[in-house]
């Protein structure tokens, strides 16, 4: 879902201010998490004052900040004790033509009651079978029931087992998605750097080292934040 959100961001810059605010929230949360982290582990440098003139590095910093903001959004939804229909809207569905689309683009998702999701396929009934399968295979841990062109999903109440499942999903799926998004940014920036500094090997080497350090630092910050949120959730398990 993080990568899906990255694609949506590329389609419009209207969320820039929101993401900047989310990045600030992320930074604050990471500071708290670092205080509790193993002191034997040192964080890679996140600020490169000697590369302020390097356009590739500066653009990469902005891209990483956007993804970090998206991670905060994803974790907020994931660990919320309330039903969030966006978790269902973002489920990717593989259609008969082989294309993957989020559920929100092929059906109307609404909250019928506090613990029931209604997914209406009236305008796209041929997609209901694929959507049902996608929901069943997702990490939502629910079983949709079909009535005509509508799927109904009973959301299970919060329990010890469900909290533990949410914590496990965060450490696995969400962290992997986040790392994949960060790695894509690194790969794109590294390729751009190689082309831009093809005749300046020293600058290319310095840029590559900076990009790699930024990648590792972002991965560590993301891991710290996820671990902090997991611990907070599991504290509520009796």
Curated annotation (Swiss-Prot):
GO molecular function, one term: ribosomal large subunit binding
One annotated Gene Ontology cellular component of this protein: mitochondrion
Taxonomy, superkingdom: Eukaryota
SUPFAM superfamilies: Ribosome recycling factor, RRF
Main subcellular location: mitochondrion
Cellular localisation: Mitochondrion
GO process terms (BP): translation
Protein keywords: Mitochondrion, Protein biosynthesis, Transit peptide
Described purpose of this protein according to its UniProt entry: Responsible for the release of ribosomes from messenger RNA at the termination of protein biosynthesis. May increase the efficiency of translation by recycling ribosomes from one round of translation to another.
Entry's family note: Belongs to the RRF family.
Protein name per its UniProtKB record: Ribosome-recycling factor, mitochondrial
Organism of this sequence: Caenorhabditis elegans
Gene name, Swiss-Prot/TrEMBL: mrrf-1
């Amino acid at each position: 879902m993080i990568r899906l959100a990255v694609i949506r961001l590329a389609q419009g810059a209207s969320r820039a201010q929101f993401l900047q605010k989310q990045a600030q929230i992320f930074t604050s949360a990471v500071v708290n998490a670092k205080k509790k982290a193993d002191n034997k582990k040192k964080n890679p440098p996140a600020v490169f004052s000697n590369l302020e003139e390097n356009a590739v590095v500066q653009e990469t910093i902005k891209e990483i900040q956007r993804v970090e903001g998206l991670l905060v959004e994803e974790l907020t939804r994931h660990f919320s004790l309330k039903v969030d229909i966006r978790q269902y809207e973002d489920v990717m569905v593989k259609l008969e033509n082989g294309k993957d689309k989020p559920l929100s683009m092929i059906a109307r998702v609404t909250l019928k009651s506090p613990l029931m999701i209604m997914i209406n396929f009236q305008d796209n009934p041929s997609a209901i079978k694929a959507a049902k399968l996608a929901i069943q295979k997702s990490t939502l841990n629910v079983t949709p029931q079909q009535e005509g062109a509508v799927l109904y999903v009973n959301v299970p109440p919060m329990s010890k087992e469900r909290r533990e499942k949410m914590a496990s999903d965060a450490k696995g799926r969400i962290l992997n998605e986040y790392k994949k998004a960060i790695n894509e940014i690194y790969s794109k920036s590294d390729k751009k750097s190689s082309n831009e500094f093809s005749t300046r090997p020293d600058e290319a080497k310095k840029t590559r080292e900076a990009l790699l350090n930024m990648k590792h630092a972002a991965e560590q910050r993301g891991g710290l934040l996820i671990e902090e949120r997991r611990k907070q959730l599991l504290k509520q398990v009796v």
